[in-house]
A protein has these predicted regions:
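Helical element adjacent to the flavin cofactor pocket in flavoenzyme catalytic cores
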Residues: 132-185, 189
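Short beta-strand to alpha-helix junction loop
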Residues: 55-67, 97, 132-148, 253-258, ...
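Dinucleotide-binding Rossmann-like beta1-alpha1 core, especially the glycine-rich loop
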Residues: 45-124, 128
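C-terminal catalytic lobe of FAD-dependent flavoproteins
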Residues: 278-361
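Short hydrophobic core segments
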Residues: 6-8, 181-193, 322
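Beta1/beta-strand and adjacent pyrophosphate-binding region of the FAD-binding site
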Residues: 1-13
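Active-site substrate-recognition segment that forms the wall
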Residues: 13-24, 46, 51, 82-85, ...
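Glycine-rich FAD pyrophosphate-binding loop
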Residues: 22-41
């Protein structure tokens, strides 16, 4: 069968890429081997435009948030299930300095639509320096969203659950051939781990391990709380607590160190006897050395693209950046400054060039 696009991977990036291609009436196929543990499947689903550490907006934070909010709201309708909704987030200040910094920005032009001076009152939370509430915050039930996307595309014969190897791809004139299928373009959305034959294996993607706790507590409020860690309500009196960030640990298991780190942070605002641990999970985020996404064209395989490297902000970034990549491919529009994968072309060696020539001949 002839397709316009092959999408490799059905995590957050691949799912959103499929939904964006659907808007453009493109013929596409998503392939994914359905690994049990991925960063997308254990993602907490928190979305907001802020970097709390310095009380600044993330890179293009408000623009990305506004577009993503519209995108996921529409997805609720398309997928016939509400997996996304706006949800109040309260920042518990860690010092009077942070409190003053927040309040000084509330009425400024840059933050007037993002920060609120409203303070919430909590009976069971240690909150000596006060708190502030975001005007823009939301959560996505990532597991349910991915499941719904898979079902949606299975019904349209746009999804196959199978493993993928670049060794099975051959060049057939203008097209890429996989089995009996032909594709004009390939978009790799595979997360942090590449096999040695992947044409984008030259890129400096850094797996960043994150671990979360699932806890139960009758004392936590039905708000997203942030103070060193986040607490996100899920169902009834259950919450997700997270997350850790570790570039060095590549072990595929949960760790005691991560559990202790999360407990030490949550105890700063919630006494340990006020909650119990139900479960612990881990995943690996795809991060980059300059903390910017990896989006764009392969140096020599001109119809091969990558959509990756969004780390813990894929829920925030992927909708708008996915739209930009599709418009870049179809209409030759420019990508956002700083995300184009061409900034790492100097990593592409003669050895990588030889590998790519073997893959497509």
């Amino acid at each position: 069968m002839n397709y316009d696009f092959l999408i490799v991977g059905q995590g957050i990036a691949g799912s959103i890429m499929g939904l964006q291609l659907e808007k453009h009436n493109q013929r596409f196929l998503i392939v994914d081997k359905n690994e049990k543990i991925t960063s997308s499947k254990v993602a907490a689903g928190l979305m907001h435009p802020m970097s709390f550490k310095r009380c600044v907006l993330n890179w293009k934070g408000e623009t990305l948030y506004d577009y993503s909010h519209q995108f996921y709201t529409k997805c609720n309708e398309i997928l016939s299930d509400k997996t996304y909704w706006e949800f109040p987030l309260v920042r518990l200040f860690q010092s009077y300095e942070e409190q003053n910094n927040w309040l000084s920005k509330v009425s400024t032009k840059q933050f007037v639509h993002v920060l609120s001076e409203r303070e919430e009152k909590f009976d069971n939370i240690n909150n000596p320096f006060g708190n502030g509430r975001l005007k823009k915050s939301a959560k996505l039930d990532v597991s349910a969203f991915l499941k719904n996307v898979k079902i949606h595309f299975e019904r349209q014969n746009n999804f196959r659950e199978e493993s993928f190897s670049t060794q099975n791809i051959k060049k057939d004139g203008y097209f890429y051939k996989k089995g009996n299928d032909l594709f004009k373009y390939i978009i790799f959305c595979q997360g942090p781990f590449f096999d040695e034959f992947n044409p984008f294996s030259y890129l400096p993607i850094i797996p960043n391990k994150g671990e979360i706790l699932e806890i139960q507590s009758e004392f936590l409020p039905q708000f997203i709380l942030s103070k060193g860690v986040f607490s996100i309500p899920t169902v009834e009196d259950k919450f997700i607590l997270g997350a850790t960030y570790n570039h060095n640990d590549l072990s595929r298991k949960i760790t005691e160190d991560a559990r202790l780190e999360l407990l030490s942070k949550v105890k700063k605002f919630l006494p340990q006897n006020n909650f119990k641990i139900i479960n612990q999970k881990y995943g690996f985020r795809p991060t980059t050395i300059d903390r910017k996404p990896l989006i764009g064209n392969h140096p020599i395989l001109k119809n091969a693209f990558i959509f990756n490297g969004m780390g813990s902000k894929s829920i925030l970034m992927a909708p708008l950046l996915g739209k930009q990549l599709i418009e870049h491919i179809l209409f030759n529009k420019k990508l956002s400054e700083g995300v184009n994968v061409s900034r790492f072309d100097h990593y592409f060696s003669a050895q990588h060039k030889e590998l790519c020539s073997k893959l497509v001949t």
